[in-house]
């Protein structure tokens, strides 16, 4: 006979007390992902436009990036985070709006870096779209 399933107790997230961190904004043509880490690179919170309920081409809009950045920022501020360095990667539409949303949540932004990878004539690019 099968044993009754033990009541799975929800694991309480321990509240870390981290005052400064790094916000990694990855803005692609299809989505915008925001990950907030501590100085060592350990993830504190993350969010994306798709996680916020945007589907299809609406994920790539600046508004979707703003909502995702507000969500990730709110989660990180629960851990006591106050100051952020921002690293922006990619060519997407949500770069600036995600940055403004992080400021609106109440973070003090100390530096902004563009870490978009640029090839020194590496792989052959995709063919041009003809619309």
Curated annotation (Swiss-Prot):
Located on the platform of the 30S subunit, it bridges several disparate RNA helices of the 16S rRNA. Forms part of the Shine-Dalgarno cleft in the 70S ribosome. HAMAP family: Ribosomal_uS11 (MF_01310). This is Small ribosomal subunit protein uS11. Pfam families: Ribosomal_S11. It comes from Paramagnetospirillum magneticum (strain ATCC 700264 / AMB-1). One of its GO terms (molecular function) is structural constituent of ribosome. GO terms for biological process: translation. It comes from the Bacteria. Belongs to the universal ribosomal protein uS11 family. The keyword Cytoplasm does not apply. Keywords: Ribonucleoprotein, Ribosomal protein, RNA-binding, rRNA-binding. InterPro entries: Ribosomal_uS11 (IPR001971), Ribosomal_uS11_bac-type (IPR019981), Ribosomal_uS11_CS (IPR018102), Ribosomal_uS11_sf (IPR036967). The gene is rpsK. Part of the 30S ribosomal subunit. Interacts with proteins S7 and S18. Binds to IF-3. GO terms for cellular component: ribonucleoprotein complex; ribosome. Signal peptide: none annotated.
């Amino acid at each position: 006979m099968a044993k009754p399933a033990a009541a799975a107790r929800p694991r309480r997230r321990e509240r870390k007390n981290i005052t400064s961190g790094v916000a990694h904004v990855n803005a692609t043509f299809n989505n915008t992902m925001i990950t907030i880490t501590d100085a060592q690179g350990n993830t504190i919170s993350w969010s994306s436009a798709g996680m916020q309920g945007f589907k299809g081409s609406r994920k790539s809009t600046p508004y979707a990036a703003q909502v995702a950045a507000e969500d990730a920022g709110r989660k990180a501020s629960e851990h006591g985070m106050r100051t952020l360095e921002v690293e922006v990667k990619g060519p997407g539409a949500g770069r600036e709006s995600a940055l403004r949303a992080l400021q609106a949540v109440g973070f003090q932004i100390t530096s902004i870096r563009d870490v978009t990878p640029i090839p020194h004539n590496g792989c052959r690019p995709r063919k041009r779209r003809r619309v």
